[in-house]
Amino acid sequence: MKTITLNNHNYELIENYKNAYDDQEVQNRFTDYFEPYDYVVGDIAYSSLRLKGFYDTKNKKAKKINDYKNLEEYLKTNCAVDCKYFVLKKID
């Protein structure tokens, strides 16, 4: 898997459905808001990238809305049908 550095943190690209990951696009959208999250998911609809942070289930900050175990539900209910998406996992 590919390792990516964003705001001095390392992430591993663990899923890249339909080749959704675009380094330049992510660099432009990623802010310090996403730094506390264990995972960052990007989905593309109408040619626009949207990012959302998720916590690992073991993280005390995890709630139903941002628990990584609910990723499939998020993709089905909040994203365009069969949209391109990627998942970054924080590794440091």
Model features per residue range: what roles?
Residues 1-45:
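N-terminal leader/targeting segments and the first structural element of proteins
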Residues 8-17, 59-62, 85, 91-92:
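Compositionally biased, intrinsically disordered or flexible polar/acidic segments
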Residues 12, 40-41, 50-52, 84-89:
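Ordered hydrophobic segments in well-structured contexts
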Residues 20, 24, 61-66:
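Ordered, soluble secondary-structure elements with a strong preference for glycine-centered loop motifs
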Residues 35, 42-59:
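N-terminal interaction modules that seed assembly of large macromolecular complexes
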Residues 63-92:
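Helix-rich interaction surfaces within compact, conserved domain-sized segments
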